[in-house]
């Protein structure tokens, strides 16, 4: 059975990228990257609501907690780790949790994302409070973790 999620499908625009010249590879990647602003623009209302939710969370003393698996989790941890040096925030204000724990930052932890119970346990371990905002990051939108 073939996985129908868009994140698990081949991109027809990059199907033969491995056969392309270096310059053509750059052109293919640049063409795909140019699609991002339109995608962001199409979700601007949803993104604005997320920003407003984060602002409200911070104003009442809550934390922003990213949670995700694999690359999605790594990006959450990366963003959280950049907040103190970039914006001077307390390291507790924005946190990142990745399925499989710190080891998953450098090596794949297969199966760590497969149960919601792992996510609940990790959120409990960080001392999740009612005033916190949790943002789950998943490319497919279907990862249990």
PLM regions: where:
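Well-ordered alpha-helical segments embedded in enzymatic catalytic cores
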Residues: 24, 49-53, 118-122, 145
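Active-site cofactor/substrate anionic-group-binding motifs, chiefly glycine-
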Residues: 51-104
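Glycine-rich oxoanion-binding loops at beta->alpha junctions
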Residues: 82-134
């Amino acid at each position: 059975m073939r996985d129908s999620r868009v994140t698990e499908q081949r991109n027809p625009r990059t199907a033969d990228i491995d056969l392309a010249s270096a310059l053509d590879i750059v052109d293919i990647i640049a063409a795909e990257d140019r699609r991002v602003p339109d995608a962001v623009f199409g979700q601007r209302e949803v993104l604005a609501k997320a920003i407003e939710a984060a602002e409200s969370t911070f104003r009442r003393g809550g934390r922003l907690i990213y949670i995700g698996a694999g690359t999605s989790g790594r990006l959450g941890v990366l963003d959280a780790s950049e907040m103190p040096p970039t914006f001077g925030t307390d390291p507790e204000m924005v946190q990142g949790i990745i399925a499989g724990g710190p080891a998953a930052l450098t090596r794949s932890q297969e199966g760590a994302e497969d149960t919601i119970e792992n996510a609940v346990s990790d959120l409990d371990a960080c001392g999740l409070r009612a005033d916190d905002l949790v943002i789950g990051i998943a490319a497919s939108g279907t990862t249990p973790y």
